[in-house]
Amino acid sequence: MSNTICLKQILAGEVEALEELLKIEEKMGNILLEGDAKALHGLNMQKEEIINTINEAEKQRRGVYTSSLTLKEFILKEKPPAAEELERIRRRLLQLQASLQRQQKINRHLLKHNLRFLEYVLEGLFPQKGVPHYLSSGEVKQKIIASGLLDSNA
């Protein structure tokens, strides 16, 4: 089998894997909005499997395509029918990577927001007693401690 055909198959496999990864990231975004945190674990396991698949495809690609040329440069040297197909796959890979980066950025933002909200709720339930502050005279200045909802002092 020629290197071009083999490269095409490997890249097509990477496209499929990235499409699956994007679907999972979109599901994760919905879960982060809806709050079903238990479902995140299963999706993270699926993501790990897909990432391993992508890494394996990348190793195969390096085995087939050992040139120092970029994929775009390689395509420019190919003959028209094969070059057109490889260019279509290359553009799809770029599109998927951009979509994946955008969705991951959204998910990170949602995750940070959820963690800040959780921290706010926990602070309301279990307020920190604060560290004593010392005045220049050596006396201890205590912060006024608000009672939390579950505080035994409330």
Regions found by a protein language model. Give the residues of each.
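Short terminal interaction segments
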Residues: E78-A154
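Extended, charge-rich alpha-helical scaffolding segments
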Residues: M1-K77
